[in-house]
Amino acid sequence: LAKVRPDGSTVLAYDQKEIDKINPENMFESMGEKSNGFELPGWEPERMARIKELFEMYKDVDEEKLFNNLVYFLKAIQPVCEKYDIRMAIHPDDPAWPVFGLSRIITDKEHLLKLMKAVDAPFNGVTLCTGSLGSNPENDIPDIIRSLKGRIHFAHVRNLQYNGYRDFQE
């Protein structure tokens, strides 16, 4: 959460080599030591106290199960979204690859289009997050934008700098 740059400023950063040194149980403590007191939503101490239990609950949830559950959810809320003109905008997985063995399902153009086809309704759209999608340098973001044609309901523009394989900062 606070990688120190040569000029003394700090940036958000992700380095797979650092992630590979920890496990879900000690992740909170490890990241807390490096965050300068900052906290991300979902990283609250009361949630992190249950991390081992939560990982156990999701150990058998593969990409297919996760995707099917997402489609089920989006179809279930469709009537309410249409009634109240609510635009849902799914945020891509960040980073765009599995972490600690947890499946990722919204990582690239193929997966975004698959979801738009599975729930083909105006309320169902995308948050175009250039950081999440850009975490995989093979994602062609301009092509993704063209492919989504009107299904982008929100944009979250981030500026990534690559430092190496699965290592970036913003």
What positions do the PLM features span?
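Active-site acidic/histidine proton-transfer and metal-coordination neighborhood
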Residues: 1-125
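Gly/Pro-rich active-site loop or hairpin
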Residues: 67, 99-113, 133-170
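Structural preference for beta-strand elements that scaffold enzyme active sites
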Residues: 85-89, 123-127, 151-156, 163
